[in-house]
Amino acid sequence: MTLHAYLGRAGTGKSTKMLTEIKQKMKADPLGDPIILIAPTQSTFQLEQAFVNDPELNGSLRTEVLHFERLSHRIFQEVGSYSEQKLSKAATEMMIYNIVQEQQKYLKLYQSQAKYYGFSEKLTEQIQDFKKYAVTPEHLEHFIADKNMQTRTKNKLEDIALIYREFEQRIQNEFITGEDSLQYFIDCMPKSEWLKRADIYIDGFHNFSTIEYLIIKGLIKYAKSVTIILTTDGNHDQFSLFRKPSEVLRHIEEIANELNISIERQYFNQLYRFNNQDLKHLEQEFDALQINRVACQGHINILESATMREEINEIARRIIVDIRDKQLRYQDIAILYRDESYAYLFDSILPLYNIPYNIDTKRSMTHHPVMEMIRSLIEVIQSNWQVNPMLRLLKTDVLTASYLKSAYLVDLLENFVLERGIYGKRWLDDELFNVEHFSKMGRKGHKLTEDERNTFEQVVKLKKDVIDKILHFEKQMSQAETVKDFATAFYESMEYFELPNQLMTERDELDLNGNHEKAEEIDQIWNGLIQILDDLVLVFGDEPMSMERFLEVFDIGLEQLEFVMIPQTLDQVSIGTMDLAKVDNKQHVYLVGMNDGTMPQPVTASSLITDEEKKYFEQQANVELSPTSDILQMDEAFVCYVAMTRAKGDVTFSYSLMGSSGDDKEISPFLNQIQSLFNQLEITNIPQYHEVNPLSLMQHAKQTKITLFEALRAWLYDEIVADSWLDAYQVIRDSDHLNQGLDYLMSALTFDNETVKLGETLSKDLYGKEINASVSRFEGYQQCPFKHYASHGLKLNERTKYELQNFDLGDIFHSVLKYISERINGDFKQLDLKKIRQLTNEALEEILPKVQFNLLNSSAYYRYLSRRIGAIVETTLSALKYQGTYSKFMPKHFETSFRRKPRTNDELIAQTLTTTQGIPINIRGQIDRIDTYTKNDTSFVNIIDYKSSEGSATLDLTKVYYGMQMQMMTYMDIVLQNKQRLGLTDIVKPGGLLYFHVHEPRIKFKSWSDIDEDKLEQDLIKKFKLSGLVNADQTVIDALDIRLEPKFTSDIVPVGLNKDGSLSKRGSQVADEATIYKFIQHNKENFIETASNIMDGHTEVAPLKYKQKLPCAFCSYQSVCHVDGMIDSKRYRTVDETINPIEAIQNININDEFGGEQ
């Protein structure tokens, strides 16, 4: 047995010497003694290619490239393997999770964490870590006996030891872990004749675990020769750049001493890898104590980008330059990263530049539709059919793939489910899921067309098919008793779903279409699923288990599944992490994300055992564990060194100033260190570089057109743009090869969000030959014509959800107050506290079950909200009693509807208006409350409108003047037109147009001592003071509040008197009768003007800006109109807000509808 060590810094030819040596042996004797090259898993393919691609090698059976586990299998083939079944990673984790659940009550520190999935994963990692470093449960138990140990540490180790011991007992004589198989491999080494004849080479490692050192020791002892290659200068200083590989060398020296053999060291000092002085100097001086600055020759670049996306776009452009101008191949280029956020950017950006690439990382299968379907199916059963997992299950399209437009059908089903609050076993209620119920979805009174009916029938059928499958699955699983039964039931359910046939069909189609990677994913998904089921049967077999526990354990197994994708082509860019990727001798290496916090990366302890506990363990038990955080932090410079020395020709470092979440980022201190090694190595700011060199952006045809669009848009906004972009536009426009899609991009340049004015015929088709509308519809048009067009022309509806909306709350208050008002005939004065509570309870019991399919009884939160609503109603009734006590006006009519043709005698007649086109305008609506007061054969009427929102409980006469607030004037006009139907006298005059704010009042106090309990209720009631406009007629003023006298301001209506008895300007909101009539008549003209504009086909995106606010803030149609402040601000409509509306209305002549003058 001989031991060789090839030692040297990066690029000094160590691996080349090894490969040359192996190849010479292969050429000299192709059938000679075995040669084994041991390398990390990530390097084996690359090293195999080095032999396969050598034209001088005509094939050989001598050499094998293996990692430690594959080497153990090779020995087992010769001497015989272990009799136990080997546990996969998933099987190990499932077993440990089940043990944790069984032993939970015995845990001391981790009892509360045991129920979480992540805990068993951490515990599995810790046990595997112990096994790698040859720590047994006995080691832990011996260590726990230390009386000086902290209680928390003692409890922690006792918990881990308990699970570890139980795990070892479960697998004893029946199963074996990957770590244990390596120990068995060590035991088998003396029996292997093949190993005794072998020359062993170990390359690509920078550190080893205890079990791996034991393997190396066995190889040295039993193999013919062992050669280990290490990237180190041999310096054992713990603060040296090469601390980590030097630590390996120290361990190898200890092994050699134990075996009483010497190490034949060969030092490599001459640099061979690097093609230029820049990279040689970078490698030699990176760890130098005294800096020797030299001129940079341009083979090292540092790029600064504003964002990570801009950074990767620039890398993609530079790769294209490498291929086109430097004649590199994609396989000559590598990208190394550390921040996981970059992986998504590679997938989203590199395909845009048609750059082939392979990311050397394993991807979890959990997000694949098939896996999402299975996990959602499990959650449906676990959660008793809750809506979220059900919808996730449906949206995977795995169980609904046989339906045409299945995604659209599922969307409709989702709308219905969210509107009706379907959950639990309500999914099984066929009465809920019928076509008639679907017809009412979001559109009251709508009659289904034949096509709509057929679509909804398909939705119902799809839902029934999926439910039948879930019920079959649930039934099969509920009949199982053992794990084997459950696994069998699960597999049979998948066959019942026809999942195997469906997946194989999809795989074949993908293969035929050349999408081999996606096809491979499907194969791995199915094989992985079967493997988990096999593991469950292997580990648990006929062990009894509850369905709930089985589904938990099964889900744990699914979490472990990962895609292992083989590169689809040899000529592609290699992408990997700086820590794990094995890329050597690339012509150009890009190191992206070189930011502080990423390189170096703060290393924090993520295992259950803390750094302090590791150190204590090593000191007391003399057992080495995995490196602590401070040791790993010292090795960050080595990680950077290894990454940047992978290139032969060029190295490009890049970083961004903003992270993926918008946070500020700083440059890596390593880049500052690198920059200090060279003169004239400047950081290239990418935006500034492109501004000076616009041609550098023109590397890829499609992406150039997108950048061209941005440049031309800037040019149109009078920004300075390089002439190169105008020249580029002409070249692209005149080229048949390049101009595809250019017209579409150019049309976006002149896009100004202009809508099309509807023609007369189309307007009538959309809106009808007469307009039947509520007041709010006209107010909506005044807010924005497009809003009206979207809601009443296109009839777009928001998805209705099973939750209480603001308008639902308003409807509840209206209905409750109507119910109570009718019960007491509007005589609020008669109410006492007992009566208020009785009537409130009656009203709520009658009305709340009708709200949103009994929504307010669906959960504890909504039942609490119901009580809050009751409290608000009780306070409101107290306020109404207070107001009624001091007013001569009596509430007479409640929730009074009006329309052109009344349906009952209680409804009022609304006079028809006519647009300028001759289209009838029929206004309909409902007046909350009409109060009347009669004196001297003259009836005065108050319009009372209940509002649950404070913002809408104010009458703004400027808005009234401009037609933005039309409700109150319309209601008063309707009442004045219907004196006979309302039972009023021949002479009827307006009293007040008033808003009543239904709310829960709040009063602020500076301290508890300021609260006067006797006055508190009175103060709360005064918060309900009516707001609006009152007729200045003295009869009306006196009747509104009988307490009015000089120097008194009413707390129930907006009226106050001065010392001389005149109306106070500050405390009164009044207008004379003639002015109110003018407002009413002007309001009619606003109706006519608005309706005429509607029928003229106006659909402009033109919101009306009032008091610096836009209606867009609360508009549901922004995603449709795409309103943009930069593009559409010129279309914002405004009004003169400085006018005095009363003076303005008095100064204009208003014609009544018969052409006379009022």
From Swiss-Prot:
Enzyme class, one word? hydrolase
Query: Which family, according to the similarity comment?
Result: Belongs to the helicase family. AddB/RexB type 1 subfamily.
Which residues are involved in binding ATP? Answer: G8, R9, A10, G11, T12, G13, K14, S15
The name this protein carries in UniProt is: ATP-dependent helicase/deoxyribonuclease subunit B
Keywords of the record: 4Fe-4S, ATP-binding, DNA damage, DNA repair, DNA-binding, Exonuclease, Helicase, Hydrolase, Iron, Iron-sulfur, Metal-binding, Nuclease, Nucleotide-binding
Q: Report the cofactor remark.
A: Binds 1 [4Fe-4S] cluster.
Gene3D superfamilies tied to this protein: 3.90.320.10, P-loop containing nucleotide triphosphate hydrolases
**Oligomer and partners:** Heterodimer of AddA and AddB.
Tell me the classification of the organism that encodes this protein: Bacteria, Bacillati, Bacillota, Bacilli, Bacillales
Which GO terms label this protein's molecular function in UniProt?
4 iron, 4 sulfur cluster binding; 5'-3' exonuclease activity; ATP binding; double-stranded DNA binding; helicase activity; metal ion binding
Biological process terms in GO annotation: double-strand break repair via homologous recombination
Is Membrane given among the entry's keywords? Answer: no
Task: Give every UvrD-like helicase C-terminal domain span.
Answer: 269-583
Q: Which organism is it from?
A: Staphylococcus aureus (strain Newman)
Show the NCBIfam families listed in the entry: addB_Gpos
Taxonomically, which superkingdom?
A: Bacteria
EC number, UniProt record: 3.1.-.-
Extract the Pfam families matched here.
ADDB_N, PDDEXK_1
Residues covered by the UvrD-like helicase ATP-binding domain = 1-275
General function of this protein: The heterodimer acts as both an ATP-dependent DNA helicase and an ATP-dependent, dual-direction single-stranded exonuclease. Recognizes the chi site generating a DNA molecule suitable for the initiation of homologous recombination. The AddB subunit has 5' -> 3' nuclease activity but not helicase activity.
**Additional record remark:** Despite having conserved helicase domains, this subunit does not have helicase activity.
The cofactor required is: Mg(2+); [4Fe-4S] cluster
Indicate which residues the UniProt annotation says bind [4Fe-4S] cluster: C784, C1112, C1115, C1121
